[in-house]
């Protein structure tokens, strides 16, 4: 492939960082920002944090977030956050030729670097994408004893559950746990009397037959709407109490409805 002239470069591409370009009209996302920051590091850095998480396939990462990279550069370009943390060779993997923190190390970094709610939601998404177990993440954190923020990180990791399928499901789970309820089982399968699967409840306390579901989007498809109604009716006939939560529901409302459900089963 031939070299581009300066005119071709300026007319067809836009600079992301110095000497790093993308085609005009390209929509930024976490993966693109990660690749650009790695090139900006002259291919020497190790992508970390949300950048590593995106490369490992995690969802729900804001396209406007900066890129995160472990690099010795103390004057990063705009849109790049550099960390100077020590890292062992076995905590680095290659993705598309780029050096990236492993999923386990990424989870520990997220727990150390970000506020609890942000970190739990991010690690839930990463763990789900990379098929990590919360117990294994906790074990990985033990090798970092003495690191700044590790005690807080361990408390954060204790709240992780890969069963949460979205940040709002994480929010809902944390809300009820912090209010004193035992951690619910996530993505709990519910079967009818014939052994056929009715559906998976986002969160459930099966011994009480109480379930919580977060409705992230309204079903406009009539067929899907009818299926949802039939599923809810079947669960109700089997003795389940299903609490459906939407973005319009405040914390007090959710907890009030849950208390009533528990009182009925006490």
Which role does the model predict for each range below?
Residues 1-5, 43, 84, 127-266:
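Surface segments flanking catalytic/ligand-binding clefts of nucleic-acid enzymes
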Residues 1-151, 167, 266:
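Short gly/ser-rich loop at a beta-strand->alpha-helix junction or flexible surface loop bordering the NTP-binding
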């Amino acid at each position: 492939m031939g070299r581009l002239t300066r005119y071709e470069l300026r007319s067809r591409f836009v600079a992301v960082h110095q000497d790093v370009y993308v085609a005009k009209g390209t929509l930024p996302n976490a993966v693109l920002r990660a690749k650009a920051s790695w090139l900006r590091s002259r291919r020497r850095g190790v992508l970390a944090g949300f950048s590593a998480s995106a490369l490992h396939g995690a969802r729900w990462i804001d396209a406007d977030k900066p890129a995160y990279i472990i690099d010795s550069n103390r004057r990063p370009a705009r849109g790049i956050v550099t960390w100077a943390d020590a890292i062992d060779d076995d905590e680095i993997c290659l993705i598309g030729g780029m050096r990236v923190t492993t999923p386990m190390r990424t989870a520990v970094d997220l727990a150390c670097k970000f506020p609890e709610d942000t970190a739990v939601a991010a690690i839930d998404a990463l763990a789900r994408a990379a098929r990590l177990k919360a117990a294994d993440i906790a074990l990985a954190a033990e090798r970092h004893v003495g690191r700044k923020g590790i005690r807080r990180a361990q408390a954060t990791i204790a709240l992780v559950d890969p069963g949460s399928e979205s940040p709002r499901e994480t929010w809902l789970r944390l809300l009820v746990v912090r209010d004193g309820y035992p951690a619910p089982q996530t993505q709990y399968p519910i079967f009818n009397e014939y052994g056929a699967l009715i559906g998976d409840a986002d969160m459930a306390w099966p011994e009480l037959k109480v379930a919580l579901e977060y409705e992230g989007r309204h079903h406009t498809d009539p067929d899907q709407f009818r299926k949802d109604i039939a599923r809810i009716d079947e669960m109700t006939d089997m003795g389940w109490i299903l609490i459906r939560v939407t973005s319009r529901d405040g914390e007090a409302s959710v907890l009030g409805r849950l208390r009533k459900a528990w009182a009925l089963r006490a």
